[in-house]
């Protein structure tokens, strides 16, 4: 639901309907907070293009929609409403996270080895936050210094992928967040199918690892190895996206169509909206 609403928000933005884009992103964020990340690339591109009015309307519509959906539950059931935030603050590194991969292969006990029951992992939370801030700073540098303005889908993919890679939780369904963004950012079928295959294959050792029967289950390292391969595949996609940002002539979206960039012969950004 969140993925469909967020992607529809990008479609509305592409059709220059900023308020509708904000409403859809706000609805998506009410279902799952990650669509709020879409506003960051829009902010960067709005700054670069010098057109912040449309962005302001999108952000205002997103905030108002999110609040409109959440406020009744927030007022009637405040503890239940806040449980999502409490859970995410207190949970440790998930089995799909890079932090658990390191623990699996090295015996490292993590950033907060002496936590009591349900104590928040303060050091881990701080590390995750700092790493994501650094990623956002790098994305801002790319957005503002690339020879041609990056496409919305490219920066949005980099933002969401960075969030997943450094986050302490990567639930299996989170990979769906990347699918529409990857297709828009890097429309190369073989590359995308290779990545999707690797991601799908994580399911097999996961199930065998969780099977619970020592005679039939797999060692943890089989699972964490596939997680590492998946993360490396996502990093490769990010590298390819950055490479095409700085070499727009290699971008399939920007070559061979009307409305071309003078240097590329293709479309500037069909999802640009600015």
Regions found by a protein language model. Name each.
Residues 1-7, 31:
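Multi-pass, polyprenyl lipid-linked donor-dependent membrane glycosyltransferases
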Residues 6-20:
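Membrane-interface transmembrane helices that cradle and orient dolichyl/undecaprenyl
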Residues 19, 23-45, 68, 165-174:
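Transmembrane helices and adjacent periplasmic/lumenal helix-loop junctions
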Residues 37-64, 71, 75:
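Perimembrane helix-loop-helix junctions
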Residues 65-71, 160-168, 196-208:
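Aromatic-anchored segments of alpha-helical transmembrane domains
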Residues 73-105, 217:
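Extracytoplasmic catalytic-loop and juxtamembrane helix elements of membrane-embedded
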Residues 92-165, 242-274:
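Aromatic/glycine/proline-enriched transmembrane-helix motif characteristic
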Residues 194-274:
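Aromatic-enriched
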